[in-house]
């Protein structure tokens, strides 16, 4: 580059070259500023249209910043994966696939639309992979799209390649372990991380992630030990522990900790104010212990004392509180008085209670409300089928069971053995497995036939 500039200078055209660069730079800045204004003013569609127009009119004025803005715009307007692939193709065409910020943004975009395969393609084609932000984006993409096994595998590869860790990437890895219930693996990751980088041991966010992993995995004793050992605590620390107790059937411990949270923490000389997430844990604890009046009091306190606006989760907890206590009428009235439109989760909570208490009339009404939102959930048919069965309405039950058989999908679960995550499927989910199941059944049939021919008594020793 220096040789070219010297040559231009010797020819006396360097001033013209400077003018061209200045013109090019000014045009790009104006274009990028316009895109930024559209994005900040909440008009992502206009920004994307403007970007496409400018590219068609004068492709040379599109720089890496323009492309970066276009990706952000696509993410902001929840664009389709096709839009992302078009920008992805442009990135390749312009040779920007070595720009980490662009590649990281593309990974984030594909993750937001659930297209993890394309996100991985972007990751793999990035020539320089020493940037921790890129690894974090890809591992987060797997975790956010319910592919925690791949997230852990990629984290292990990152460790093997000696990429410098930070608190964020370890937090994401612990989140993946929490999703899988892989406590041992999470503990190993945390231990290795603080050995490689000692200051991570003082990272409160990271310790909160470890606490959250214990909580999600039902390890409340380990969670409480970590909680008590933490010199510093914030609202997330308390909220995670309150949630942990509530989720694992220790409602009284959850409510006691909530009371302690609101008193002065002598070690920090501060009062930790609960947030909206904290109240979800508190309401869950009230629900699981049948404390209807206390739950109603906390729900009111959240609004009046802490000026917090209830979200769907809070309304859902209140409906669950009424339903668990058998107050179906109160639950129904509460739903009808909600300031927001109730979602299927809230209606299904009431439907489950109708099934438990055999309330056919209310159950049928609730199912109609659910079908207005979603007709494909198998559990809705099962719940109503159980209601019919409890009342001896066998014809209606039979119709519901027929619908269930047509819609049922196999479930999945995971188990940690050593340092390996194993996946199990409740039924065959592809043709190969169906063939294998058929072969196993045939072999079993032959064995039974042979045993019978030799006068063996199945299930007894000879």
Swiss-Prot record:
UniProt-annotated stretches for the region Type E(+) motif: 419-452
Gene3D superfamilies referenced in this protein's UniProt entry, alphabetically: Tetratricopeptide repeat domain
Molecular function (Gene Ontology), one example: RNA binding
InterPro entries: E_motif, Pentatricopeptide_rpt, PPR_At4g14850-like_plant, TPR-like_helical_dom_sf
Keyword Repeat in record: yes
Pfam families: E_motif, PPR
Region (Type E motif): 346-418
Domain of life: Eukaryota
Family the entry assigns: Belongs to the PPR family. PCMP-E subfamily.
Protein name (Swiss-Prot/TrEMBL): Putative pentatricopeptide repeat-containing protein At1g74400
Native source species: Arabidopsis thaliana
Phylogenetic classification of the source organism: Eukaryota, Viridiplantae, Streptophyta, Embryophyta, Tracheophyta
